[in-house]
Amino acid sequence: MSFVTENPWLMVLTIFIINVCYVTFLTMRTILTLKGYRYIAASVSFLEVLVYIVGLGLVMSNLDHIQNIITYAFGFSIGIIVGMKIEEKLALGYTVVNVTSAEYELDLPNELRNLGYGVTHYAAFGKDGSRMVMQILTPRKYERKLMDTIKNLDPKAFIIAYEPRNIHGGFWTKGIRRRKLKDYEPEELESVVEHEIQSK
């Protein structure tokens, strides 16, 4: 490794790459642990420690120049962003989306069910009168698509999304993994719903 330490630019590049990899694994492991994916987190921690042992010894012993210190700090921050982006792309787990709507005529529950979503809905009452509340469980990778779909169907809907800590029983655990959502674009739904309302 002497050829690395003797070349200052190569040293800077090495510090950056090693620290990005190390902090990426560290960030992913922390997120996965919090989400309850213990075995995946353990596998990621193996890679994290491997990078630490192989690379960080070299890095830490060469932080005697200002460019190396700045590169180390920059690599650390980039590693956090990369780790979070990877976790977002993997989209592990599920999201619960609660929707409150005043538009009963839209028949949102059946519209969403026809697209492949599992929907539980019930009547509720707020300051401005009766409302329909829907609870929808969806894999995280479909969360953005579901949000866009609801906004196109009912732009005034009140939407809250959160990740459940534990799920047990009912349609959710048995059906959601087998259920496949229809291939559609959320923007296409607005004109369809408007046409249905006008035809009533």
Swiss-Prot record:
Protein's UniProt keywords contain Transmembrane: yes
Taxonomy, superkingdom: Bacteria
Presence of keyword Membrane: yes
The entry's keywords: Cell membrane, Membrane, Transmembrane, Transmembrane helix
Chief site of localization: membrane
NCBIfam families registered for this protein in UniProt: PRK04164.1-1, PRK04164.1-5
Protein name in UniProt: UPF0316 protein SAB1848c
